[in-house]
Amino acid sequence: MKDKIRLELEGIDIRFDEPLKEYTYTKVGGAVDYLAFPRNRYEIVRIVEFAKREGIPWQVLGNSSNIIVRDGGIRGFVIRMDKLNSVTVSGYTIEAEAGANLIETTKVALFHSLSGFEFACGIPGSIGGAVYMNAGAYGGEVAHILVSAQILTPAGYVETLDNRELRFGYRSSILQENGAIVLSAKFALRPGNHTVIQQEMARLTHLRELKQPLEYPSCGSVFKRPLGHFAGQLIMDAGLKGYRIGGVEVSEKHAGFMVNIENGTASDYENLIAHVIQVVEKSSGITLEREVRIIGDPADTL
């Protein structure tokens, strides 16, 4: 199959048996069969059409900041959008390709004195991933500013969905159900004062640095916020701050985070998540729901 891929997808940057731990914020994860870095939409379509024709599974990953890849890796293609990263400004509108870095996009907004993107100034990830999960923080979220997104449907068609059609919810969108790929997104911002925007971004960045364990690899916020509660507080109340399985620990700095402190594995993450859910449910009666996505095969399927 590798020779066929080299022949039929000639010119596309494809890496074979590539360890995904090098690409994830958790620094865990096994190898993927075929890791593709398309440069444009045409190359994405070529990869997807080839995969469908050959019966090879495929999926898209952004910056992998809120994802855990299992230790057995991923079969088939993983498409990384890193090379589709242009950001353009027209009036009060920013249009960004799916692979554009979210934090860097907020800096573009700041440069043009456009307000509305400040909430995302410290959120790691890509534009595509941010749209996919309706990323948010400090009272703001993608749904508040997104006008539309261009997507590639599973059938191979390029379509534009407006804000309403994307059916945003708390850390969710229709994209989590329909299997479409985000190609680009358009955001409507408002004119603002450069200094005021800069000060707000600095304030939010400072808050993030104070409260979050940025010094360790992690998958970001592990659980969604339960209605009327904070996941981190529930975990702390259950006595789990600092609890460790293998090389992964419930952060001492913020119990809503799990950090890879010493050569942790995806299995360590999964086991710790399951343990936290069980203990919190027993102590509070509240069942925590994962925000982080877990994908791939467990190690015992290798």
UniProtKB/Swiss-Prot annotation:
Pathway: Cell wall biogenesis; peptidoglycan biosynthesis. InterPro entries: FAD-bd_PCMH (IPR016166), FAD-bd_PCMH-like_sf (IPR036318), FAD-bd_PCMH_sub1 (IPR016167), FAD-bd_PCMH_sub2 (IPR016169), MurB (IPR003170), MurB_C (IPR011601), MurB_C_sf (IPR036635), Oxid_FAD_bind_N (IPR006094). The active site is at 171, 221 (proton donor), 291. Cell wall formation. NCBIfam families: murB, PRK13905.1. Residues 27-192 form the FAD-binding PCMH-type domain. Its EC number is 1.3.1.98. Its cofactor is FAD. The keyword Coiled coil does not apply. It is found in: Cytoplasm. One of its GO terms (cellular component) is cytosol. The keyword Cytoplasm applies. The lineage of its organism: Bacteria, Bacillati, Bacillota, Bacilli, Lactobacillales. It catalyses: UDP-N-acetyl-alpha-D-muramate + NADP(+) = UDP-N-acetyl-3-O-(1-carboxyvinyl)-alpha-D-glucosamine + NADPH + H(+). One of its GO terms (biological process) is peptidoglycan biosynthetic process. This is UDP-N-acetylenolpyruvoylglucosamine reductase. One of its GO terms (molecular function) is UDP-N-acetylmuramate dehydrogenase activity. Belongs to the MurB family. It is an enzyme of class 1 (oxidoreductase). Keywords: Cell cycle, Cell division, Cell shape, Cell wall biogenesis/degradation, Cytoplasm, FAD, Flavoprotein, NADP, Oxidoreductase, Peptidoglycan synthesis.
